Amino acid sequence: MEVILLERIGRLGQMGDTVKVKDGYARNFLLPQGKALRANEANKKKFEGQRAQLEAQNLERKNEAQAVADKLNGESFIVVRSAGETGQLYGSVSTRDIAEIITANGFTLHRNQVELNHPIKTIGLHEVSVSLHPEVQVKVMVNIARSTEEAECQAKGEDLTSIEAIYGIEEQPLSEEVFDDEDEAEDQA
């Protein structure tokens, strides 16, 4: 099915482009969301008549998104979850969880705007892309930890999944520290 795009859509094209997409994608996503019109003569004339208005609305939305992006860019958000000793989460952190945390911190965000290839399943610092507008994207840090104290340690750069951090071992003892005497070391061997 051929459609006329009413806004920029990644991997498809810019506003005003006539592109061919699969019927299901057009019927189930593009047309109901108001992101495209069917490419027939009546809709082409309608689009050309409203093009200036649509471009102005798109520019306004882009400017609003850019203002939010300036505040949001580089921000760090803490997510507290249960995890095992090795740092594996009991469950995962998904786009919905990240959107809820960002919204709880005063930003308006929908989970579809969070771009995550797969759910996060380990503690640590994770960089996540947020698409506020098709042309405006920002990166935020999501600090996933077992507690807020642990999150502060991770923010300082400490690795909480290493053996030293898990068991409280600072360094391995040297053989001279274990055995008082070289003779004892030889007797033990």
From Swiss-Prot:
Any one GO molecular-function label of the UniProt entry: structural constituent of ribosome
GO biological process: translation
Stated name of the protein: Large ribosomal subunit protein bL9
Family annotation (Pfam families): Ribosomal_L9_C, Ribosomal_L9_N
Its job: Binds to the 23S rRNA.
Record family assignment: Belongs to the bacterial ribosomal protein bL9 family.
Gene: rplI
NCBIfam families, alphabetized: L9 (TIGR00158)
GO cellular component entries: ribonucleoprotein complex; ribosome
Keywords recorded for this protein, A-Z: Ribonucleoprotein, Ribosomal protein, RNA-binding, rRNA-binding
Statement: the UniProt record of this protein carries the keyword Signal: no
UniProt keyword Ribosomal protein, yes or no: yes
Cited PANTHER family: 50S RIBOSOMAL PROTEIN L9 (PTHR21368)
InterPro entries: Ribosomal_bL9, Ribosomal_bL9/RNase_H1_N, Ribosomal_bL9_bac/chp, Ribosomal_bL9_C, Ribosomal_bL9_C_sf, Ribosomal_bL9_N, Ribosomal_bL9_N_sf
